[in-house]
Amino acid sequence: MTKNFTVPLIILCFVNDSLAQNEKLPYVEIPKHAEVYTAGAIVSRMIDGLGFRFYWATEGLRIEDLTFKPSDKARTIAETLNHIFELAQMIHNTALKKDISYIQNEEMSISEKRSITLKMLKKSSDIFRNTQNIGQFKISFNRDGKQSEYPFWNQINGPISDALWHCGQIVSHRRTSGNPFNSKVNVFRGIVSD
């Protein structure tokens, strides 16, 4: 019986991966900035910058890039991408005012994780952009019934900054593995040059 499902399952995984790669994802370019400087608009722009960097840091990764790590004690690019996925969940759950919980992602392909990460960042950015009181968003953990809460400041120096840091690691690692970041990407302007 198992043999009957093996080939369709492999094809389904391949089709899902192909569809995810052809899907129009956010952050090919940074969205237009807000007209007014507010705390919410600034946080939104930080997340948009993260989304743009993540999009291009992970665009065009090869199998050999995903398994690359510069030393035995370092994370592979795939492990780093997975960590950014978890950080994006923290940002997203905070935007939704939910306790931090993680999506089980062991069965997801890299392209699925990438797609979901970008969509979570975009949704979070949209929520924060239109917020007048950023202080209402707390980082909330519920571990085995024990609740702990942190102010939004920790979101800035925690998950947002950490994810930016790790995007830089992916760019560095992929350069070392022989597949450099697209040189036409202009992170200052948030565009890709022709």
Label for each model-derived stretch:
Residues 58, 62-65, 91-100, 128-136:
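Membrane-helix exit/interface motif
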Residues 109-167:
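Acidic/histidine-rich alpha-helical segments that form the ligand environment
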Residues 34, 39-42:
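Terminal, regulation- and interaction-focused segments at domain boundaries
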Residues 53, 57-58, 123, 127:
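Well-ordered alpha-helical scaffold segments within catalytic/enzyme domains
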Residues 106:
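A short, structured active-site edge motif that brings together acidic residues
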Residues 1-26:
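Bacterial Sec-dependent N-terminal signal peptides
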Residues 22-25, 31-32, 44-48, 55, ...:
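Short, contiguous alpha-helical
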Residues 60, 83-86, 119:
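Residues within well-ordered alpha-helical secondary structure of globular protein domains
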